[in-house]
Amino acid sequence: MPFYGLRTLPHMPVLSESSATVRDRLLSLPPLLYGGLKLESRYLLSPLAGYTNLPFRRIVRELGGVGLATTDLVNARGLLDRSPKTLQLIETCLADRPFAVQIFGGDPVIMRDAAQLLEARGVDSIDINMGCPVSRITKVGAGASLMCQADRTIDLARAVVESVKIPVTVKMRLGWDSTQLTAPAFAREFEQVGVAAVAIHGRTREQGFSGVVDRTGIRKVVEAVERIPIIGNGDIRTVEEGERMFAETGCHAISMGRGALANPWLFRQFVEWEATGEYSPAGTFDDRLVLLKRQFEYAVEQRGIERAITSFRKMAHWYLKAMCVSASLRNQLQEARTRLEFDTALDDIASQGPTRGSRSGLLPSLHISVPAGPNANW
């Protein structure tokens, strides 16, 4: 049963008149389909390395509104080698459906075999990573570097599509740099070889996460295809930013990664907005504390207490920043080594409350900053 938190706050006001036009278009569209897979909403959780693990996917699903959730990016060769660390990335549960696994690699045979392994394990959809900008991925011919190898990349996509019966999608960027904006051409070719959908992040590899998303570039990808859905991605942290993505690109769906870290309620807000033009606010301090504790318990279930404490620090940082927790208490939780120390830190956080905003009301919006270039550490 979805978990809706403790909210008693009023709905946010109706958005602009242009919002109604966007909503009318969305409501007139047929359901979002990845091949034969029908998605319950057009609001998707993007793959985000280190964050979109099973515990977090369970949380956003409980809050509602997610049409599809995708894993962290997964090394195709690691899957075939049965690496325990890699296999943990694809763990799922009954509540985590439908879900996709995003794989990366530059060898068509390895990618094909990894796709077949995933299909045998019951995965609903496979996503090919063509967007990761970090050097450790691109230097092995994977991620965004695939956008520089047209023939090989099309052959890779075809090999994966033809090897499985489940839908195969691609996530890519606009291109390698501003002189190689190859996304529209790739999208056309992907449609021809049977790719079910394309998600497009509106920056180049050279940009990393710097600058602003180029929605005009995303629109060119939308216009390049005839049938398959295009998913807009990048800088969608609020309903208003999502509305703008729909309005300026004509995309069929949107996906969020960093925005969902700051506001796990974002998917439900979009569903409410699409249906009514209004949406309920994000969670309060108390709501977020409940979510933090719940996600930590899911991590304990999956990894055991010691590994959960270590691995959860990365996620806890963003929870606590969004909750406006003092730096000293954030540090206390980050330094916890035992279950007792972790629980004590949470008790202290609950006792002190937020340093800004109020415990039961709206909190200031959190902006998750990232490095300017193609950097894995943020």
Question: What are these regions, as identified by a protein language model?
Answer:
Residues 43-46, 69-71, 99-103, 126, ...:
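Hydrophobic faces of well-ordered beta-strands that scaffold small-molecule active sites
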Residues 82-86, 149-150, 200, 214, ...:
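Short, solvent-exposed helix-helix connector turns and helix-capping sites enriched
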Residues 48, 74-76, 104-106, 131-133, ...:
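Active-site beta-loop-alpha junctions enriched in small/polar residues
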Residues 62, 112-126, 130-142, 150-228:
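Alpha/beta enzyme core
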Residues 22-33, 48-124:
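Glycine-rich, positively charged N-terminal anion/phosphate-binding segment
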Residues 2-39, 43, 49, 55, ...:
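Alpha/beta catalytic cores of nucleotide-metabolism and tRNA/nucleoside-modifying enzymes
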Residues 86-88, 141-147:
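Short glycine-enriched, charge-decorated loop/helix-capping segments at active-site entrances
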